[in-house]
């Protein structure tokens, strides 16, 4: 065997160096929110396509720091409440600023305006600054959990609540 068989030639070395940043970019992100693919990414809890940037939410947590996407803050609240690691301080909870539809806010620091026409009908829109018509995260979370899943998120045959309200929609 010749002594050159174990050496990398110049062309192979350059190709390897060029591929390294590309391969590094393929590594999954483990913190912070990620861009949504509007009109393509599905909501984890209801399966509907996320299309309204003013109400989207993301949760990152668990042992693998997996990112999960939602079309409404209410779906994210319900989903997280069912996770065994829900109280882990490392869990990240992001919500889109409803005023801009382009800026992610830390959901626990955001303020929520009630009465919004949100995709799953939980009725909360996140905003950056407090106002006389907003509530904090804990208040919004409590109201969403007490209300339960909206009828839009329940499997067929499990619709509950006022049938007149459903007929109007």
Predicted regions mapped to residue ranges:
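N-terminal secretory signal peptides
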Residues: 1-22
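Residues immediately within or flanking Cys/His clusters that coordinate Zn2+
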Residues: 40
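Short cysteine-rich clusters marking metal-coordination/redox-active sites
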Residues: 43
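Cys/His-coordinated zinc-binding microdomains
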Residues: 47
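Short, non-ligating residues that shape and space the ligands of small metal-coordination modules
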Residues: 52-53
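Mature extracytoplasmic domains of secretory-pathway proteins
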Residues: 68-113
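Beta-strand-rich cores of mature extracytoplasmic or soluble domains
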Residues: 97-169
């Amino acid at each position: 065997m010749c002594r050159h068989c174990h050496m990398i030639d110049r062309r192979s070395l350059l190709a390897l160096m060029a591929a390294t940043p590309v391969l590094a970019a393929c590594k999954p992100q483990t913190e912070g929110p990620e861009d949504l693919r509007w009109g393509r990414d599905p909501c984890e809890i209801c399966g509907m396509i996320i299309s309204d940037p003013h109400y989207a939410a993301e949760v990152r947590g668990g042992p693998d720091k997996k990112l999960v996407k939602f079309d409404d803050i209410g779906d994210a609240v319900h989903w997280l409440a069912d996770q065994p690691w829900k109280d882990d301080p490392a869990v990240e909870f992001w919500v889109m600023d409803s005023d801009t539809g382009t800026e992610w806010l830390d959901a626990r620091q955001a303020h929520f305006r009630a009465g919004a026409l949100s995709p799953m009908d939980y009725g909360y829109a996140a905003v950056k600054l407090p106002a006389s018509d907003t509530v904090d995260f804990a208040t919004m979370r409590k109201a969403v959990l007490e209300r339960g899943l909206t009828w839009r998120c329940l499997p067929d045959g499990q619709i509950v609540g006022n049938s007149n309200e459903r007929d109007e929609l």
